[in-house]
């Protein structure tokens, strides 16, 4: 078996399948590597085994070597333990960002280099360019599928060793290529949601690791209107799963989460989807990461996303002495959530990002700074 110059992460999905096909067409020695990032937990969810079989089948059709690596221990320590700690603290983490940084572009890269490869490739919708002496992370051509948001923690060494073969394709074109090439995954549906939860109920899954503690649901005036099964099951702006029935004297309208008092185990809700309690124009981050190794300036303007697929929002960024950033948006933002990722862009280029630590949303600021006072919030 010849030494591969490129090792592709094959997931068993159509995206990595077409990425493998494109590389195979170039005639360079390549190999596929399937990563198992989650150990069987006895739940009966065998999606990983199905994905592995599909990955083997694709490699067989293309005539490229198949490799398997079990990274479940690395995933648990580098991603899942952090995921649980964040939820226990009342924040809403983004495990896909951490998985890319800690597993796919760290342990996978190491495994590929151990096989003798010079570069790795993945089926992400993103692009890499070398400009001005630095490697740049660019959005994928299909803006609806662009995954640069999840890749913003990558650095120069990783980008220098990475290919994104499908970054210049639209999803519809990719599907046609897969069918025309006879790839067995051409009609396979896209995976969604958090990878280790799969099709399982999120609340039931999280409850296995974080003991549930029921508490009060209150309105902005502090009146108890219902009970929740645990504050960490909910995120700001959420509507689904509250199970609030008819409340006497209130309209028959949906309720939305507007605040989480983790210390006192209280969830706050409002019937206004765009409640002022959810609005913020300022946020403070944890330490920021810059794709090129440094920010464009100490203060600069750009656009930002505070959740995946959110429209770009103009903002001003101030880099702090400790490496964190403060961001002020031109217009109020709804449900900016601590624990989620702030990702910054200059046009098509992803500059980097950081974890959101705090915002100036009225209720969240109150709860972060002191015990809740209904007189202040109302």
UniProtKB/Swiss-Prot annotation:
<keyword id="KW-0819">tRNA processing</keyword>
<dbReference type="GO" id="GO:0005737">
    <property type="term" value="C:cytoplasm"/>
</dbReference>
<comment type="similarity">
    <text>Belongs to the MnmA/TRMU family.</text>
</comment>
<dbReference type="Pfam" id="PF20259">
    <property type="entry name" value="tRNA_Me_trans_M"/>
</dbReference>
<feature type="region of interest" description="Interaction with tRNA">
    <location>
        <begin position="145"/>
        <end position="147"/>
    </location>
</feature>
<dbReference type="InterPro" id="IPR046885">
    <property type="entry name" value="MnmA-like_C"/>
</dbReference>
<dbReference type="Pfam" id="PF20258">
    <property type="entry name" value="tRNA_Me_trans_C"/>
</dbReference>
<keyword id="KW-0820">tRNA-binding</keyword>
<dbReference type="GO" id="GO:0005524">
    <property type="term" value="F:ATP binding"/>
</dbReference>
<feature type="binding site">
    <location>
        <position position="123"/>
    </location>
    <ligand>
        <name>ATP</name>
    </ligand>
</feature>
<comment type="function">
    <text>Catalyzes the 2-thiolation of uridine at the wobble position (U34) of tRNA, leading to the formation of s(2)U34.</text>
</comment>
<feature type="disulfide bond" description="Alternate">
    <location>
        <begin position="99"/>
        <end position="195"/>
    </location>
</feature>
<keyword id="KW-1015">Disulfide bond</keyword>
<feature type="region of interest" description="Interaction with target base in tRNA">
    <location>
        <begin position="94"/>
        <end position="96"/>
    </location>
</feature>
<feature type="binding site">
    <location>
        <position position="35"/>
    </location>
    <ligand>
        <name>ATP</name>
    </ligand>
</feature>
<keyword id="KW-0808">Transferase</keyword>
<feature type="active site" description="Nucleophile">
    <location>
        <position position="99"/>
    </location>
</feature>
<feature type="site" description="Interaction with tRNA">
    <location>
        <position position="124"/>
    </location>
</feature>
<keyword id="KW-0963">Cytoplasm</keyword>
<dbReference type="Pfam" id="PF03054">
    <property type="entry name" value="tRNA_Me_trans"/>
</dbReference>
<dbReference type="InterPro" id="IPR004506">
    <property type="entry name" value="MnmA-like"/>
</dbReference>
<feature type="region of interest" description="Interaction with tRNA">
    <location>
        <begin position="307"/>
        <end position="308"/>
    </location>
</feature>
<dbReference type="InterPro" id="IPR046884">
    <property type="entry name" value="MnmA-like_central"/>
</dbReference>
<dbReference type="InterPro" id="IPR023382">
    <property type="entry name" value="MnmA-like_central_sf"/>
</dbReference>
<feature type="site" description="Interaction with tRNA">
    <location>
        <position position="340"/>
    </location>
</feature>
<dbReference type="GO" id="GO:0000049">
    <property type="term" value="F:tRNA binding"/>
</dbReference>
<feature type="binding site">
    <location>
        <begin position="9"/>
        <end position="16"/>
    </location>
    <ligand>
        <name>ATP</name>
    </ligand>
</feature>
<keyword id="KW-0547">Nucleotide-binding</keyword>
<dbReference type="GO" id="GO:0002143">
    <property type="term" value="P:tRNA wobble position uridine thiolation"/>
</dbReference>
<protein>
    <recommendedName>
        <fullName>tRNA-specific 2-thiouridylase MnmA</fullName>
        <ecNumber>2.8.1.13</ecNumber>
    </recommendedName>
</protein>
<dbReference type="InterPro" id="IPR014729">
    <property type="entry name" value="Rossmann-like_a/b/a_fold"/>
</dbReference>
<feature type="active site" description="Cysteine persulfide intermediate">
    <location>
        <position position="195"/>
    </location>
</feature>
<dbReference type="GO" id="GO:0103016">
    <property type="term" value="F:tRNA-uridine 2-sulfurtransferase activity"/>
</dbReference>
<keyword id="KW-0694">RNA-binding</keyword>
<keyword id="KW-0067">ATP-binding</keyword>
